[in-house]
């Protein structure tokens, strides 16, 4: 009897920590993931441009918002200090094709567009999968495809884990990716912009980072802060399968974390993709209430 009671208590405790089943709510403009009735995240397919913002800041095809299990949105979009920053997004400030340079980071030259998307629920509602196919185009001509995969897990213990992958393929001509042109910076690749917050703390495997960082390799980075009085954190982990070893990361206390690829070292500051030979990058993200 005692053993049965203990098993019941343990089962009840697990249920308290587990969320309701995940489900997708789809519209022509976005896919929303919900855990029961609670919003988890949205992927925005349609062009986004709030009233009063310059037309050249229009964009699509990124994650925003992303909420913790207790409902704190940690992502920012159209922040006045960097209007081109947009939730969780894949972008490079230098994309070279056919002798021309384009800036996906700052929304100049290359245009992103969605081609298709497929949302699934697996494991009895414990896992959600979103597969997205986007393109980059110049003057209406497609120059690259982007296959994005997002796997989102049911929340547990006040946290939620997501795995994210990009497969980028040049189409008819070689495509060169570089980070920032500034000598001491190398942002470009996988990027996260944070919502307005207070008491920001950034950590890596080396401990608390008191200053902003560029060009330093890190296996993970986390930003914790107070959002309207509620403490939450987002952590990025590099996948060991990614090319290039431990990546350089861009850490900004104004509210930005980025994983730089290919980074900037004396040995390499660019990577060229040959047509039909894809590049795949993988990262995991964990959001948590503190």
PLM feature segments, named:
Residues 1-8:
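Bacterial N-terminal signal peptides that target proteins for export
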Residues 8-18:
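Hydrophobic h-region of N-terminal signal peptides that target proteins for export
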Residues 180-232:
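Glycine-rich (often Gly-Gly/Gly-Pro-rich) flexible segments and glycine-rich loop motifs
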Residues 9, 83-158:
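Extended, loop-rich substrate-binding clefts of extracytoplasmic carbohydrate-active enzymes
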Residues 43-46, 54-56, 155-203:
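Acidic (Asp/Glu-rich), glycine- and aromatic
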